[in-house]
Amino acid sequence: MLRVALVGATGAVGQQFILALNRHPWFELTHIVSSERSAGKKYIEALRDPHSGNLRWHSKEKIPDYIRDATLGKVEDINPKSFDLIFTALESEEARMIEPQFARWVPVISTAAAFRYEEDVPILIPGVNDDHVMLLNTQRKNRGWRGFIAPLPNCTTTGLVITLKPIMDKFGVEMVIMTSLQAVSGAGRSPGVVALDILDNVIPYIPKEEEKVQVETKKILGTLDSRAINPASLKVSCTCTRVPVLDGHTEAVYVSTERSCEPAEAKEEMLKFSKSAPIRNLPTAPKDFIFVHDDPTRPQPRVDREINDGMTTMVGRIRKDTAFNNGLKYILLSHNERMGSAKGAVLLAELLKDREVL
């Protein structure tokens, strides 16, 4: 068993990490850290609202017994040499200060954007760009670290890239236009989205989200040379919106392929990709990497987001689009807090262990 620590344990993403690591066959969570005000408290106590006394636990699943009475530590007291791996669920500013201190000694898997766009840092989605793992060795050499920082992509990027990969490999992709309908949980709980802003409403702007998706999509689908990733040449345009849905990001995707692609062929390639994904034997990997609905009313967040514990990217309404050369369009649904965040990070850790990088 590898000994792991979690920094940011009480937030929405941190809680998903707690669940994803419960009874994990490879990783043992031995240390948890949250904010300064929570240090020294038991985990269950730190989750209580100081004013109302309400328990701020945001999952339908109960708090695992193994963590309820665990004591939260301070970031500055962590000895990274005591762990084989550190997961972080931090805001970007905090991550930029804290993660390099850990990575000098031990691998760090991060959900933050702080280091995603640096030349020697791959943005990894298990099963999509596994060959980019080799860049972590370059990062170690460049920075003189024993460990590394391996960030996940933005949760909106995750489902988009997973569905584009099989299309790109078979038919090539010239251009992608995407509009997202993103769940409120993607904004976190603190500060999150104000109820009066989102109820009976759609917010047509999420700061920096569109730029992240555009850059990350090209980087993840790019090619690796000895020192860096050459971004894919496709054009990416997107509009990201916030909608009154709790969990699950829905995206309407329009693709112009280099070679003609019929809807049935796109479905076939997605299913082939799903069945042959090299992550299938990892503990957290879903039964289906991609699932394609024939029902034109699916996928739907409330109905589909929990399938395979939120680790499957759901696709539906694959159609021709005559507005583009070799045009194709479809709807996808990806669970932003599972595959797009904490459980996706645990899956990445499994991949790195399987590749003997950890």
Task: Tell where the protein language model's regions lie, with residue ranges.
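Charged docking surfaces used in two-component/phosphorelay signaling
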Residues: 184-358
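N-terminal Rossmann-like NAD(P) cofactor-binding subdomain of oxidoreductases
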Residues: 1-198, 202-205, 229, 234-235, ...
